[in-house]
Amino acid sequence: IEMMKKTSFLINTSRGQIINENDLVDALKDEKIAGVGLDVYDKEPLPQDHKLRFLPNALLLPHIGYVTAENYSKFYSQMIENLESCLENKPLRIIS
């Protein structure tokens, strides 16, 4: 974070643990970087009283960065297929 320009935005969608959140909060408060976009956190869900939640230059998502209309469609189609299979007591996707 110390090496970033003041105009930089930090984006993390991979692992929350790769960023020290206390250092990040300080950098945002002191305007050492312009902002942050996070989809992952050290502790999930992010606690309601976490300092990041109160910073105007922090965009926070609830770990949904992977979601697309196509993903949702596949997810719900498979969910219905799984439920129907369970209710009918039929095996699903048998591999031999």
Task: Give a label for each model feature.
Residues 1-51:
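Rossmann-like adenosine-cofactor binding region
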Residues 42-96:
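C-terminal helix-to-coil terminal segments
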